[in-house]
Protein backbone atom coordinates (compact mmCIF):
# COMPACT_ATOMS: atom_id res chain seq x y z
CA UNK A 1 0.00 0.00 0.00
CA UNK A 2 2.83 2.40 0.84
CA UNK A 3 4.57 1.77 -2.48
CA UNK A 4 1.33 2.30 -4.41
CA UNK A 5 0.65 5.55 -2.53
CA UNK A 6 4.21 6.74 -3.18
CA UNK A 7 3.66 6.23 -6.91
CA UNK A 8 0.16 7.72 -7.00
CA UNK A 9 -1.32 9.50 -4.00
CA UNK A 10 -4.82 9.07 -5.46
CA UNK A 11 -4.66 5.28 -5.67
CA UNK A 12 -7.10 3.16 -3.72
CA UNK A 13 -5.79 -0.06 -2.22
CA UNK A 14 -8.06 -3.08 -2.00
CA UNK A 15 -7.43 -6.57 -0.68
CA UNK A 16 -9.67 -9.64 -0.94
CA UNK A 17 -9.04 -12.03 1.96
CA UNK A 18 -10.45 -15.53 1.98
CA UNK A 19 -12.04 -17.71 4.70
CA UNK A 20 -14.53 -15.30 6.23
CA UNK A 21 -15.97 -17.82 8.66
CA UNK A 22 -12.77 -17.75 10.73
CA UNK A 23 -13.00 -14.03 11.49
CA UNK A 24 -14.60 -12.86 14.72
CA UNK A 25 -15.58 -9.38 15.80
CA UNK A 26 -13.17 -9.53 18.74
CA UNK A 27 -10.58 -7.02 19.98
CA UNK A 28 -7.72 -8.87 18.27
CA UNK A 29 -9.35 -8.71 14.84
CA UNK A 30 -10.44 -5.09 15.33
CA UNK A 31 -6.83 -4.15 16.18
CA UNK A 32 -5.67 -5.87 12.99
CA UNK A 33 -8.18 -3.82 10.99
CA UNK A 34 -7.05 -0.61 12.71
CA UNK A 35 -3.47 -1.29 11.58
CA UNK A 36 -4.44 -2.22 8.03
CA UNK A 37 -3.25 0.36 5.53
CA UNK A 38 -5.82 -0.24 2.78
CA UNK A 39 -8.99 1.62 1.90
CA UNK A 40 -11.16 -1.38 1.01
CA UNK A 41 -11.38 -4.97 2.19
CA UNK A 42 -13.47 -7.10 -0.20
CA UNK A 43 -13.91 -10.41 1.57
CA UNK A 44 -14.33 -13.44 -0.68
CA UNK A 45 -17.63 -15.10 0.20
CA UNK A 46 -16.41 -18.67 -0.36
CA UNK A 47 -19.83 -19.87 -1.55
CA UNK A 48 -18.62 -20.95 -4.99
CA UNK A 49 -15.76 -23.06 -3.68
CA UNK A 50 -18.00 -24.59 -1.01
CA UNK A 51 -16.07 -23.14 1.95
CA UNK A 52 -19.10 -21.11 3.07
CA UNK A 53 -22.70 -22.23 3.03
CA UNK A 54 -25.02 -19.65 1.52
CA UNK A 55 -27.24 -19.71 4.60
CA UNK A 56 -24.24 -18.78 6.81
CA UNK A 57 -22.84 -15.95 4.70
CA UNK A 58 -25.03 -13.18 6.15
CA UNK A 59 -23.88 -13.99 9.69
CA UNK A 60 -20.22 -13.93 8.65
CA UNK A 61 -20.56 -10.61 6.85
CA UNK A 62 -22.49 -9.15 9.76
CA UNK A 63 -19.59 -10.03 12.08
CA UNK A 64 -17.10 -8.52 9.65
CA UNK A 65 -19.21 -5.38 9.31
CA UNK A 66 -19.33 -4.94 13.09
CA UNK A 67 -15.56 -5.30 13.29
CA UNK A 68 -15.08 -2.68 10.56
CA UNK A 69 -17.45 -0.30 12.34
CA UNK A 70 -15.46 -0.70 15.57
CA UNK A 71 -12.15 -0.19 13.78
CA UNK A 72 -13.39 2.86 11.90
CA UNK A 73 -11.13 2.10 8.93
CA UNK A 74 -11.30 0.35 5.59
CA UNK A 75 -14.62 0.09 3.82
CA UNK A 76 -16.08 -3.39 3.59
CA UNK A 77 -17.01 -4.89 0.25
CA UNK A 78 -17.82 -8.44 -0.82
CA UNK A 79 -16.06 -10.47 -3.49
CA UNK A 80 -18.90 -12.81 -4.42
CA UNK A 81 -18.25 -16.05 -6.26
CA UNK A 82 -20.49 -16.63 -9.30
CA UNK A 83 -19.41 -20.19 -9.94
CA UNK A 84 -19.48 -23.70 -8.58
CA UNK A 85 -17.05 -26.53 -9.12
CA UNK A 86 -17.99 -29.24 -11.57
CA UNK A 87 -16.89 -31.91 -9.08
CA UNK A 88 -17.75 -30.47 -5.65
CA UNK A 89 -14.37 -28.93 -4.77
CA UNK A 90 -12.36 -29.34 -7.97
CA UNK A 91 -12.72 -29.59 -11.72
CA UNK A 92 -14.03 -26.89 -14.02
CA UNK A 93 -15.65 -23.74 -12.69
CA UNK A 94 -19.21 -23.53 -13.98
CA UNK A 95 -21.63 -20.59 -13.82
CA UNK A 96 -24.07 -20.73 -10.92
CA UNK A 97 -27.73 -20.03 -11.62
CA UNK A 98 -28.70 -16.42 -10.97
CA UNK A 99 -32.26 -17.07 -9.80
CA UNK A 100 -31.50 -20.13 -7.69
CA UNK A 101 -28.30 -18.97 -6.02
CA UNK A 102 -26.65 -15.69 -6.99
CA UNK A 103 -29.59 -13.41 -6.16
CA UNK A 104 -29.77 -15.09 -2.73
CA UNK A 105 -26.05 -14.47 -2.20
CA UNK A 106 -26.58 -10.79 -2.99
CA UNK A 107 -29.61 -10.52 -0.71
CA UNK A 108 -27.78 -12.20 2.17
CA UNK A 109 -24.66 -10.04 2.17
CA UNK A 110 -25.79 -6.68 0.77
CA UNK A 111 -27.00 -5.28 4.14
CA UNK A 112 -23.44 -5.56 5.47
CA UNK A 113 -21.26 -4.31 2.61
CA UNK A 114 -20.89 -1.10 0.62
CA UNK A 115 -20.38 -2.85 -2.72
CA UNK A 116 -20.35 -6.31 -4.21
CA UNK A 117 -17.64 -7.35 -6.65
CA UNK A 118 -17.87 -10.64 -8.48
CA UNK A 119 -15.39 -13.43 -8.95
CA UNK A 120 -15.12 -14.21 -11.69
CA UNK A 121 -16.56 -12.61 -14.78
CA UNK A 122 -14.38 -13.99 -17.58
CA UNK A 123 -15.39 -17.56 -18.30
CA UNK A 124 -18.50 -17.35 -16.11
CA UNK A 125 -20.52 -14.61 -17.88
CA UNK A 126 -20.42 -13.77 -21.59
CA UNK A 127 -22.52 -11.39 -23.66
CA UNK A 128 -24.35 -13.39 -26.35
CA UNK A 129 -22.84 -11.30 -29.16
CA UNK A 130 -19.23 -11.58 -27.94
CA UNK A 131 -16.77 -12.60 -30.63
CA UNK A 132 -14.74 -14.69 -28.20
CA UNK A 133 -16.19 -16.74 -25.37
CA UNK A 134 -14.45 -18.25 -22.40
CA UNK A 135 -16.06 -21.13 -20.57
CA UNK A 136 -19.14 -23.07 -21.63
CA UNK A 137 -20.84 -20.77 -24.12
CA UNK A 138 -24.45 -21.72 -23.41
CA UNK A 139 -24.03 -21.61 -19.64
CA UNK A 140 -22.05 -18.37 -19.56
CA UNK A 141 -24.54 -16.63 -21.86
CA UNK A 142 -27.42 -17.95 -19.72
CA UNK A 143 -25.95 -16.39 -16.59
CA UNK A 144 -25.24 -13.12 -18.39
CA UNK A 145 -28.85 -12.96 -19.64
CA UNK A 146 -30.27 -13.83 -16.21
CA UNK A 147 -28.19 -11.10 -14.62
CA UNK A 148 -29.11 -8.50 -17.25
CA UNK A 149 -32.83 -9.35 -16.91
CA UNK A 150 -32.54 -8.66 -13.18
CA UNK A 151 -30.32 -5.60 -13.61
CA UNK A 152 -32.64 -3.94 -16.13
CA UNK A 153 -35.53 -4.21 -13.66
CA UNK A 154 -33.59 -2.35 -10.95
CA UNK A 155 -33.88 1.35 -10.30
CA UNK A 156 -30.17 2.14 -9.95
CA UNK A 157 -29.07 5.75 -10.03
Where are these regions (language model features)?
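Glycan-processing catalytic domains of CAZymes
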Residues: 1-157
Amino acid sequence: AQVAKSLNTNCVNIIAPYNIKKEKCDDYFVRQLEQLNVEIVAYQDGVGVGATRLEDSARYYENLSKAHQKAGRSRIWADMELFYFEQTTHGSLLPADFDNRIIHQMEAISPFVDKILVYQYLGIMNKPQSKAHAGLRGETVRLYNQYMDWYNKQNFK
